[in-house]
């Protein structure tokens, strides 16, 4: 009995170790694919003059986030992180590059608006509105990508389902933004962990949070 218990504990700890390794690999690949953006965001001040170059360097974020989500979703059955990441990245670029251009354009427009309105006290309402729209866009994007990974649909169908879930399962859907921000704030206290696990850990936590929503949709599909 004690031997079985020991083996179970060893298996349990090994699975944790596997996830640490997988998250590290996925995070390094994510940083590699977004290296120009990561470098620029650290060396450039965010101001109107730098927004175009930040925009151009950030269009890789959405396809690479898709690749991380897709890779982590099937990691227990397909643990070859590097191979799977690049397969899914190629698919992500085919499906999402044009959409990424649009999403990132609106994101940086909002950032620019926030920069301008922050300096004009008479436009404080617009300042907070742009912050709100920015939060909505980021939350919608991560949820959209998780939905896309879980069901084969067109871009339009994926967007519609994501919007419906944001209404029906609003708490879970909106919680993902807090998870993203909270993860980076906590890991920022330990920069080495932020570098090693930041993006992949935040994405994994968003996927875990969204799992009940996925189960809900799957039940609806089975009952239909």
Feature locations, PLM:
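Helix-coil boundary and N-terminal low-complexity module in membrane systems
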Residues: 1-112, 122-128, 139-142, 147-224
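Small-residue-enriched core segments of transmembrane alpha-helices in multipass membrane transport
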Residues: 130-135
């Amino acid at each position: 009995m004690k031997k079985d218990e020991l083996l179970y504990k060893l298996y349990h700890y090994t699975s944790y170790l596997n996830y640490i390794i997988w998250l590290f690999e996925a995070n390094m690949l994510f940083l590699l694919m977004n290296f120009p953006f990561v470098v620029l965001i650290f060396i450039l001040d965010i101001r109107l003059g730098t927004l175009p170059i930040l925009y151009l360097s950030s269009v890789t974020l959405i396809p690479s986030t898709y690749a991380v989500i897709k890779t982590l979703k099937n990691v227990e059955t397909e643990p070859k992180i590097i191979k799977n990441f690049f397969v899914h990245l190629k698919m992500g670029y085919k499906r999402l590059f044009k959409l990424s251009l649009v999403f990132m354009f609106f994101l940086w427009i909002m950032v620019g608006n926030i920069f301008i309105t922050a300096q004009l006290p008479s436009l404080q309402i617009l300042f907070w509105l742009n912050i709100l729209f920015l939060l909505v866009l980021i939350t919608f994007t991560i949820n959209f990508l998780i939905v896309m990974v879980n069901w084969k649909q067109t871009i339009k169908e994926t967007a519609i389902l994501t919007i419906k879930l944001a209404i029906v399962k609003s708490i879970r859907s909106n919680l993902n933004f807090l998870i993203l921000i909270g993860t980076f704030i906590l890991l920022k206290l330990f920069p080495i962990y932020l570098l090693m696990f930041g993006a992949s850990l935040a994405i994994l936590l968003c996927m875990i949070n969204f799992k009940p929503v996925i189960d809900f949709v799957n039940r609806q599909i089975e009952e239909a």
